[in-house]
A protein has these predicted regions:
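Ribokinase/PfkB-type carbohydrate-kinase core domain
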Residues: 43-46, 50-55, 70-212
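Substrate-binding N-lobe of the ribokinase-like
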Residues: 2-73, 80-87
C-alpha cells in the first residue's frame, strides 16, 4: 500500500516480472487469501501477463504499508500472519521446482515456518545446475542468524545491499572488515558463484571468484 494507492509488489514478484520482460518463462510463487484483495491481485497479475502459482489459503492476503520520507526512502509496516506466511508445497509447486533454471527468494518469506519449509523443499527439488539467487532483503526484525545462514548455504548467488552487509558483518562476527573484504569473505565462505552488492546512489558491484 503506497501513498498513492495499492500496488502489486515484493522483490521475488518483481524479479519474476522483469525476467518475463526479457522473454523468459517466469512464474511468481506465493499464496493468496480467500478475499477481495486476492481477486484484485489475480486480476493485476493477469493484466501484466505474469504467470503465477498462488494457492488460496485461509489467511488474509498479505499487505505492506509503505511510507516515504522527504528523500523518498521507504519504511515498511509489514502485516503478519498473512497468506504468504503459509505457502503450501503443493504438487504444482513441486513440478515448477523440478523444471526451474533460476529461482530467487528472500528472508522475509521465511519468517514463518510453513513458508520457510516450502522454500527449502522447493530449492531441494530444483535441478543441480539451477541458479539459486538469495536476495537477502532484510526487513524490520523478521530474520534470524540461522535463517540467513541456511539460505546462504543453499544459494549460489547472493544479492545484498551495503546496509545489509554491515548487519551481516556484525551478525557473523567480522564487523571490522571493509566492504570489499566482507564481500570476498562471504563469497569464499559460502562457495558462491556471484555476490551482487548494491550501494544505492553509489551504484552496484559484482563479485565472482577472483574478479570484481
Amino acid at each position: 500500500m503506497l501513498p498513492e494507492g495499492k500496488k502489486l509488489g515484493g522483490a521475488p514478484a518483481n524479479f519474476a516480472f522483469h525476467a518475463g520482460q526479457f522473454g523468459l518463462n517466469s512464474i511468481a510463487v506465493s499464496a493468496l487469501g480467500e478475499d477481495k484483495l486476492a481477486d484484485e491481485t489475480v486480476q493485476q497479475l493477469e493484466e501484466k501477463g505474469l504467470q503465477y502459482c498462488m494457492p488460496r489459503v485461509p489467511y488474509p492476503t498479505g499487505t505492506v504499508q509503505v511510507k516515504l520520507d522527504d528523500e523518498g526512502i521507504p519504511t515498511y509496516d509489514i502485516k503478519e500472519n498473512v497468506a504468504w506466511d503459509n505457502i503450501p508445497f503443493t504438487d504444482e509447486v513441486k513440478a515448477i521446482a523440478e523444471n526451474t533454471k533460476a529461482v530467487c527468494w528472500g528472508s522475509l518469506a521465511q519468517r514463518n515456518v510453513v513458508s520457510r519449509e516450502t522454500i527449502y523443499k522447493f530449492l531441494d527439488a530444483t535441478p543441480a545446475d539451477c541458479m539459486k539467487i538469495f536476495d537477502i532483503n532484510l526487513r524490520q526484525d523478521f530474520y534470524t542468524k540461522d535463517v540467513i545462514c541456511e539460505s546462504m548455504k543453499r544459494c549460489n548467488v547472493l544479492k545484498i545491499n551495503d546496509e545489509e552487509l554491515v548487519l551481516i558483518g556484525r551478525m557473523f562476527g567480522y564487523p571490522g572488515l571493509d566492504i570489499e573484504n566482507k564481500c570476498w569473505l562471504i563469497l569464499g565462505k559460502y562457495d558462491l558463484d556471484m555476490l551482487v552488492l548494491t550501494c544505492s546512489v553509489n551504484g552496484s558491484y559484482v563479485f565472482t571468484p577472483g574478479e570484481m
